[in-house]
UniProtKB/Swiss-Prot annotation:
Record: residues binding Zn(2+): C79, H82, C150
The protein, known as: GTP cyclohydrolase 1
NCBIfam families: folE, PRK09347.1-2, PRK09347.1-3
Similarity field: Belongs to the GTP cyclohydrolase I family.
Gene source species: Rickettsia rickettsii (strain Sheila Smith)
Molecular-function GO term, any one: GTP cyclohydrolase I activity
EC number(s) recorded for this UniProt protein: 3.5.4.16
Length: 189
């Protein structure tokens, strides 16, 4: 698949404006195609970014703690089904084996995956598996809680529904006590 030119993308926006009954040549919409293309470039900037590159700065120190947890990483993504936003928080825990990363690195990988067309279930797995693959900890737990505009703006019109997804690797997948502790910590916010 070849990438369309900027002008082709702008023409697609004009076509969508016509489809909804708008006149793309009216004053308020003249610059809308450019604005949409610029917004999409930022919103979907997660494509082509390498998580391994983000997580390659590791600290190989003796870990004097049993596990690591970062709560409440805020994100906004767009569902691949309706291209409508969903937003919420990500909680990440891992039990280091011999290395850790700076906490901003975890927020950065959330942003990489959130800035793509997504489904929440897949994003949860992608975050957990990327931490597992790159840091090789004893285990990883990821929980995402999000509100989906495709549920609140259309269809069933449920604006208070929160979807929770979890994915576990290593000792979090194998031992219930680790999962239980993680879920207790994430519920106490």
């Amino acid at each position: 698949m070849s990438k369309p030119t900027r002008e082709e993308a702008k023409e697609a926006v004009r076509t969508l404006l016509k489809f909804i009954g708008e006149d793309p040549s009216r004053e308020g919409l003249l610059k809308t195609p450019d604005r949409v293309i610029n917004s999409y470039a930022e919103i979907f900037s997660g494509y082509g970014k390498d998580v391994a590159e983000i997580l390659n700065t590791k600290f190989y120190e003796t870990c004097n703690f049993r596990d690591f947890i970062l709560l409440n990483i805020k994100f906004t993504s767009f569902c691949e089904h309706h291209i409508l936003p969903f937003n919420g928080t990500v909680d990440i825990a891992y039990v280091p084996d011999n290395c850790i990363v700076g906490i901003s690195k975890l927020a950065r990988i959330v942003n990489i995956f959130a800035r793509r067309l997504q489904i929440q279930e897949k994003m949860t797995v992608q975050i957990a598996e990327s931490v597992q693959e790159n840091l090789k900890p004893l285990g990883v737990a990821v929980k995402i809680s999000a509100v989906h505009s495709c549920m609140s703006m259309r269809g069933v019109m449920q604006d208070n529904s929160v979807m929770n997804t979890m994915h576990y690797t290593g000792i979090f997948a194998e031992q219930q006590k680790y999962r239980h502790e993680f879920l207790n910590l994430t519920a106490k916010r």
